[in-house]
Amino acid sequence: MSVKYIATSKLPTPWGVFAMHGFEETATGKEHVALTFGQLDPTEPMLGRIHSECLTGDALFSLRCDCGFQLQAAMQSIAEQGQGFLLYLRQEGRGIGLLNKIRAYELQDAGANTVEANERLGFEADMRKYDMILPMLTQIGVTKVKLMTNNPRKVMAMQNMGIEVAERIPLQVGKNRYNESYLKTKSTELGHMMSEYHFHDE
């Protein structure tokens, strides 16, 4: 995939000042962002996360998923580490888009789980692609990662591109009564690696 680097600016956040790097897919015009913190070292594994856009969770504070909680936890961990990165990929609704995601939520309100809802709309359970990762990481100077994720597909995608995943760090935050069924489906049907933390009351 051809991805064009556009520009870099400062991004002040509650956890510190990140650098925000803009990218554009040349074939589609789709825009993605890389956040970096501190001085990245291409010879060492960098703490990082690959985060797919979730307007409802990231910006509207939805409790239906754990996305917003994961985004904030990842940014805080990177800042506390003193260096790291976060790739923010514009793949709303596991790749089906915002309006289709709302349609899927409507089906979930009627009893479907997150996978069933996507499939009833004619989509695969997870439509996301990760081809844009390699040129983005190359631009910011990352070749080895300590990846914050519960999703084995992200680990496999990076390894298939020749990026060394030195460690997978679980990111288990944000469980609540509205998303417990969703989290169980991600574990049982999408293969996400989660501990019993998600499935028992604290």
Swiss-Prot record:
It comes from the Bacteria. Catalyzes the conversion of GTP to 2,5-diamino-6-ribosylamino-4(3H)-pyrimidinone 5'-phosphate (DARP), formate and pyrophosphate. Its cofactor is Zn(2+). One of its GO terms (cellular component) is cytosol. The active site is at D126, R128. Zn(2+) binds at C54, C65, C67. Binds 1 zinc ion per subunit. It catalyses: GTP + 4 H2O = 2,5-diamino-6-hydroxy-4-(5-phosphoribosylamino)-pyrimidine + formate + 2 phosphate + 3 H(+). The keyword Oxidoreductase does not apply. Coiled coil: none annotated. One of its GO terms (molecular function) is GTP binding. The keyword Metal-binding applies. Belongs to the GTP cyclohydrolase II family. Keywords: GTP-binding, Hydrolase, Metal-binding, Nucleotide-binding, Riboflavin biosynthesis, Zinc. It comes from Shewanella frigidimarina (strain NCIMB 400). The lineage of its organism: Bacteria, Pseudomonadati, Pseudomonadota, Gammaproteobacteria, Alteromonadales. GO terms for biological process: riboflavin biosynthetic process. This is GTP cyclohydrolase-2. Its EC number is 3.5.4.25. The gene is ribA. GTP binds at R49, I50, H51, S52, E53, Q70, E92, G93, R94, T114, T149, K154. InterPro entries: GTP_cyclohydro_II, RibA, RibA-like_sf. Pathway: Cofactor biosynthesis; riboflavin biosynthesis; 5-amino-6-(D-ribitylamino)uracil from GTP: step 1/4.
